[in-house]
């Protein structure tokens, strides 16, 4: 007998080892989307996002049913994450539940994670301030004690910067140094001169404002007067239009310039420090006192002209 009859023929389209059963393929009834995977481009040039059903036409046997992929994060309730800084805010929770689309807009605060340290720091600062307020307020209310503690730290605790020449005090050292410039002599080395006109200044802010007066770029179209700043020109234009947008809340008097309104508001103040020596009348502004002295008191103090003898 030839040796070829002793060898078992094996089909060319399959392979089977002894003791190992051949794998059975079953068609997928539905297409399952695998997150993060993309198939090869199709005929229309687009990438397929899902797996097509298998084309194997074999014997139908019950196979294992694939379970849908679970989300990477558990679905969060809207009330569970109420912090807008949390990465799992209400928008992200709705996205994982499938209620929100990818096109939902997110603010930048949604991408910052807060670990709570800043809140604890603010809470600790509030507690320290409340404790200081209770100590300074003598057992008063929480709000009043806190305000009392803050005012005591500013006024009572009291580090004020005093000028050695005139004794005037300031809250900050920068304000004091700016004030000390006014005590300089025009002949000192610290004085500066204007590069255009040569005028000397001991205060650097005053020199900076003076330099701007040589560059009058903003000119009035009505009278031709020029100004260094646009808001100065805007206030000047009100003198041509007669507009007075700044009104007094007490008497209703209107002004074209805000600074004039501030000066007028001093007349309604209860503090009137400038007193006339002749009639004992007090004024809130020194300029008003000068006008009063030049107009009323001076004329009242002058003796009436004596009548000449009748001829």
UniProtKB/Swiss-Prot annotation:
The entry's keywords: DNA-binding, Metal-binding, Nucleus, Repeat, Transcription, Transcription regulation, Zinc, Zinc-finger
Zinc finger intervals, C2H2-type: 161-183, 192-214, 218-240, 246-268, 274-297
GO biological process assignments: negative regulation of transcription by RNA polymerase II; regulation of neuron migration
Family: Belongs to the snail C2H2-type zinc-finger protein family.
Cellular component terms per the entry's GO annotation: nucleus
Domain of life: Eukaryota
Composition bias, Gly residues: 124-146
Record's subcellular location: Nucleus
Organism in which the protein naturally occurs: Mus musculus (Mouse)
InterPro entries hit by this protein: Snail/Krueppel_Znf, Znf_C2H2_sf, Znf_C2H2_type
A GO molecular function held by the record: sequence-specific double-stranded DNA binding
SMART domains xref list: ZnF_C2H2
Lineage of producing organism: Eukaryota, Metazoa, Chordata, Craniata, Vertebrata
Signal peptide annotation: none
Disordered as annotated region, ranges: 71-90, 120-156
SUPFAM superfamilies: beta-beta-alpha zinc fingers (SSF57667)
Record flagged with keyword Repeat: yes
Protein name: Transcriptional repressor scratch 2
Primary role: May be involved in transcriptional regulation.
SNAG domain as annotated region, ranges: 1-20
Classification via Pfam families: zf-C2H2 (PF00096), zf-C2H2_6 (PF13912)
């Amino acid at each position: 007998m030839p040796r070829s009859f002793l060898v078992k023929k094996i089909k060319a389209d399959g392979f089977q080892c002894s003791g190992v059963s051949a794998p059975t393929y079953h068609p997928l009834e539905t297409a399952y989307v695998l997150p993060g995977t993309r198939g090869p481009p199709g005929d229309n040039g687009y990438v397929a996002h899902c797996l097509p059903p298998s084309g194997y036409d074999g014997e139908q046997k019950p196979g294992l049913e694939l379970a849908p992929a679970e989300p990477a994060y558990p679905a969060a309730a809207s009330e569970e994450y109420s912090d807008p800084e949390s990465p799992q805010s209400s928008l992200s929770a709705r996205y994982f539940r499938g209620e929100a689309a990818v096109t939902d807009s997110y603010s930048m605060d949604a991408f910052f994670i807060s670990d709570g340290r800043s809140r604890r720091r603010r809470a600790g600062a509030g507690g320290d301030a409340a404790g200081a307020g209770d100590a300074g307020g003598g057992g008063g209310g929480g709000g009043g004690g806190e305000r009392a503690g803050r005012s005591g730290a500013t006024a009572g605790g009291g580090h004020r910067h005093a000028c050695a020449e005139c004794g005037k005090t300031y809250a900050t050292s920068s304000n004091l140094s700016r004030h000390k410039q006014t005590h300089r002599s025009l002949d000192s080395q610290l004085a500066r001169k204007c590069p255009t006109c040569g005028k000397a200044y001991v205060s650097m802010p005053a020199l900076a404002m003076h330099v701007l007066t040589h560059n009058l770029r903003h000119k009035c179209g009505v009278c031709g007067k020029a100004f260094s700043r646009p808001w100065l020109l805007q206030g000047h234009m009100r003198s041509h239009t007669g507009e007075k947008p700044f009104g007094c809340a007490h008497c209703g008097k209107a002004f074209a310039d805000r600074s004039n309104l501030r000066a007028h508001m001093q007349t309604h103040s209860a503090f009137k420090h400038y007193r006339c020596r002749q009639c004992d009348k007090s004024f809130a502004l020194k300029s008003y006192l000068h006008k009063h002295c030049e107009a009323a008191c001076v004329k009242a103090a002058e003796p009436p002209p004596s009548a000449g003898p009748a001829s």
